[in-house]
């Protein structure tokens, strides 16, 4: 069913986009370790 495929793609993007965004922030935060310690 095409609807299921579209729903799967929408869900994947909905999960991957925020995850990638948080991952970038995490990497930048770890890179600047002097910010916390």
UniProtKB/Swiss-Prot annotation:
GO terms for biological process: photosynthesis, light reaction. Its main location: plastid. The chain crosses the membrane at residues 5-25. One of its GO terms (cellular component) is photosystem II. It is found in: Plastid, Chloroplast thylakoid membrane. HAMAP family: PSII_PsbM. This is Photosystem II reaction center protein M. The gene is psbM.
């Amino acid at each position: 069913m095409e609807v299921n495929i579209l729903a799967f793609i929408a869900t994947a993007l909905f999960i991957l986009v925020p995850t990638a965004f948080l991952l970038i922030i995490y990497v930048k935060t770890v890179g600047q370790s002097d910010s916390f310690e």
